[in-house]
Amino acid sequence: PEKPQYEGIHAIVAPSASFAADDGSIALNGNSASNVARLLSHTGHSIIKGMGEMQITDAEYKEIKEFTDKLVSNNNTPTEIYQTIFRWITTNIQYQSGYVDNNPYPVFKTHQAICQGYANLLNVMLHTQDIPAMNANGMLVPVGGHAWNYVYLDDWYVSDPTNNGHFRMSELDTYTHLVPMTLDVDLFEDEEFVYHFSEERLNIRQVKKSGKQLIVPFGTNGFRVSAFNPSKPLPEGVEEIYIGQNIESLGENLLGLSIHAPNVKHAFVDSANSKLKSYGQVVYRDSQPYYIPAAATVIQFLPIHTFGKNFLKDHAHVETIVIQSGTKSLDAYAFENCPRLQKAYIPEETVVDAKAFYGVHPQFQILRGIVKN
């Protein structure tokens, strides 16, 4: 017999004019260290307005400043002050492989730290002397994860107090073992967005204001933006996100949109984007679902071999899902704690575990057949 066909469920397609156009911004296609050097050479040291997200009280800071003032009392230039502080840290702080508190004050008092503690203390001590510095986190080749600093004296320098390393930033060949992935300062800011360097990309860290439709910018200050992974909540009115051809990542380890965009119903990706694509409210990367808007009510999926456990969990708004032909199976608890989910359109040939839908609407039903868009 002919298979049932359901009509009236359409995948919304955004017009191409909705996306940010190529504004000629420069793509950061070099290695990570060269990209950071390019960005910092452009921004200058005025971007450093504090100590990042350092955990330190006013009393702790005051004590470190009083000590540092005495330590550098015979120094006259920023370079001399930096050298004295750097020498004191590399001489007096001992690397401790076990657990230690790496906030700057405990490091200052106990003289024990791992790399993060070294970088934190150098950052704070330089800050007490009005010398611009920031923390960098990334990789120490071939060892693994590492933290160090960028410092501005007469020029930008790369400072690795853990390993007694000091390099001019422009001399990239001298510190190829340091691969920066994240900086703890904002690089650019305008009326709508705040940008920083994260996960080796120029990223939009914050959306300051937007209407219902959020158009992700193509570039800023002449540099192409390649990531949109906010670390602060989007404005409440944002319901639609338009992701242009420039965006390659929404986050590697943690998608900020999954946390900070509770009211987004639709996410669209420019068809010219070679890394991401969108269909039926879902953003895909490498043919796998990557981001599902938290307020989407109808979600259509491209064919996926298997919907595994917790494929979609704790989605408060979805009411209808559509599974396409080519999907082999839905495992137990594939869709869990989706209290408004009432309908699932699933091809007849797709195997569905008896517990594939758990914690859904009391009137939930599976409709077998073909969905005509």
Role assignments for model-derived ranges:
Residues 1-31:
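Intrinsically disordered, low-complexity N-terminal segments that are enriched in acidic
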Residues 45-108:
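Secondary-structure boundary elements
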Residues 81-85, 89, 111-126:
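Active-site nucleophilic cysteine motif
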Residues 89, 135-140, 160-164, 219, ...:
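Active-site-proximal beta-strand/loop segments in catalytic clefts of secreted hydrolases
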Residues 117-181:
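Hydrophobic/aromatic-rich core segments of domains that either
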Residues 151-154, 207, 285-286:
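Active-site beta-strand termini and strand-to-loop segments that position acidic
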Residues 192-199, 209-226, 234-249, 257-281, ...:
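Structural signature of tandem-repeat unit edges
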